[in-house]
């Protein structure tokens, strides 16, 4: 039975990571075609990526959009979760459901709706528009994560802080937020991950300044290009580093 479990785990992880391994392997291809046989290793295409102005600009744009939209999503999600947890609102179950609806809607539908709305109000395609779109898709996730961690014990501590003379903004900023730090960090990390490689909304809402996934798409439209493998390997490496950072922070905050 143990051997079957090991075989099953090996097949599962192989199925998940084999495409990534192949992508990383052929990112070191020396020739101009990312197909067998493998000839290398060579850093030729990594150098080509670094020297490609559009790819590096797309990378910077992706980082800026991911950071800004994730921060906004966490802030708005935290405030919404705090409001629902501390106040009784008419029809609050329906209101909570409405906040989480975007989690079940296709990004294509959300992107098209935002595109129509922005055209109606005269807002041009830009990184700002893409950032707003990323907030729309990430805010429900942040809200769900933070709201699930709010409990009665926090209300008791908040009430004690008010009894000691703390203002409401001090209670929220100095009491509630620190207690929810693990949830806030997890929400920010997941939001960053989703925003980092999101393509559909970025493609619909940007024009001249685009994000890295859109630039990769534009690169692939002209045919097979080893630079796409190098970019994919770099993006995967960044994602792994973020995951390791998240685990290290979680381990440091975990009680002994």
PLM features: residue spans?
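N-terminal, non-cleaved signal-anchor transmembrane helix
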Residues: 1-53, 57-60, 64, 250-256
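C-terminal transmembrane helix and the adjacent membrane-cytosol boundary/short C-terminal tail
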Residues: 1-8, 91, 147-162, 166-175, ...
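Cytoplasmic-entry segments and transmembrane alpha-helices of multi-pass inner-membrane transporters
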Residues: 2-13, 79-114, 158
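Transmembrane alpha-helices
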Residues: 8, 13-20, 135-136, 142-147, ...
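Hydrophobic positions within alpha-helical transmembrane segments of bacterial inner-membrane proteins
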Residues: 20, 66-82, 108, 112, ...
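Transmembrane alpha-helix signature in integral membrane proteins
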Residues: 28, 53-86
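Interhelical loop and adjacent transmembrane-helix boundary motif
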Residues: 31, 46-54, 196-245
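Membrane-interfacial helix termini and adjacent extracytoplasmic/periplasmic loops
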Residues: 34-38, 43, 91-92, 108-138, ...
């Amino acid at each position: 039975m143990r051997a079957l479990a090991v075989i099953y785990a090996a097949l599962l992880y192989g199925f998940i990571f084999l495409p990534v391994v192949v992508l990383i392997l052929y990112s070191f291809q020396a020739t101009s075609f990312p197909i067998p046989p493998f000839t290398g290793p060579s850093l030729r295409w990594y150098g080509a990526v670094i020297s490609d102005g559009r790819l590096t600009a797309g990378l910077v744009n992706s980082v800026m959009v991911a950071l800004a939209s994730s921060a906004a999503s966490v802030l708005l999600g935290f405030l919404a979760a705090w409001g629902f947890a501390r106040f009784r609102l008419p029809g609050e179950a329906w209101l909570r459901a409405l906040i989480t609806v975007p989690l079940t809607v296709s990004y294509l539908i959300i992107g098209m709706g935002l595109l129509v709305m922005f055209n109606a109000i005269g807002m041009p395609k830009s990184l700002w528009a893409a950032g707003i779109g990323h907030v729309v898709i990430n805010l429900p996730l942040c809200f769900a994560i933070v709201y699930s961690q709010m409990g009665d014990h926090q209300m008791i501590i908040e009430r004690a802080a008010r009894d000691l003379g703390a203002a409401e903004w001090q209670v929220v900023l100095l009491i509630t937020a620190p207690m929810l730090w693990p949830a806030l960090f997890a929400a920010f990390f997941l939001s960053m991950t989703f925003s980092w490689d999101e393509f559909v909304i970025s493609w619909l809402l940007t024009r001249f300044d685009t994000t890295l996934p859109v630039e990769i798409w534009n690169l692939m439209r002209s045919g097979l290009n080893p630079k796409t493998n190098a970019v994919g390997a770099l993006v995967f490496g960044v994602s792994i580093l973020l995951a390791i950072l998240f685990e290290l922070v979680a381990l440091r905050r975990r009680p002994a």
